[in-house]
Amino acid sequence: WERKKCFTLSTCRLAFYYVLKSLKLKKGDEVILTPIQIPDFVNAILNLGLKPVFVEVDEKTKCLDLDDLKRKINDKTKVVLATYLTGIVPDINKIQKICDENNIFLIEDISQSYGSSHNFKKAGTFGFAAIGSLSPAKIISSVGGGFILIDDKKTIDEISHNFENELSLPEKKTLLKICIFQLKVSLLTSTIIFNFFSFYLF
């Protein structure tokens, strides 16, 4: 991706949290997203004193419905999260235009769309920032992890500052649990075992 900075973290939910935190939004400011999200994304919004606002899912793209997005935007709307649930990148230029016209930060969640593009431009390069997951079952997996892609220097400095003051190395026990879980997933999804359980038992 042609972005100036890539931060790596333990999860995508932390990536989302720290992007939001770096924006220094006011209590009660609104973050628009679709209702098909992991609970911790909503928790990240609430933990920062912000308000989640849900927008309908577009039937074709499974991303934000543009008409409902326009209806839900108001003076308190500060962030729009565009999640590409099925790997399909919608007409993100239209979403970006709506955000630009209303001084809203657009964050892309590209966890399911690595390598996807719109008009020959890669997903993750349209918004103010992009986040992604590297957890099991994702297109690219590193046992666990998440990342932030961003260009804005002020925000990069703010995120770096927050990392230095708030994050610490994980405990060995935690890493061991993650590795054991990933080993189980790898075994259960191996060709022989997966075929046995999915074909012969059903």
Predicted features, each with a name:
Residues 4-5, 27-30, 76, 157:
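Short acidic capping loops at alpha-helix termini that bridge into adjacent secondary structure
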Residues 60-161, 165, 169, 173:
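Active-site phosphate-binding strand-loop segment of PLP-dependent enzymes
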Residues 1-14, 36:
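Conserved N-terminal alpha-helix of the aminotransferase class I/II PLP-enzyme fold
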Residues 19-72:
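Conserved PLP-anchoring active-site segment centered on the Schiff-base-forming lysine
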Residues 8, 33, 82:
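A short beta-strand submotif of the Rossmann-like class I SAM-dependent methyltransferase core
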Residues 151-202:
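Structural motif of enzymes handling amino- and sulfur-group chemistry
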Residues 15-20, 146:
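Buried hydrophobic packing segments
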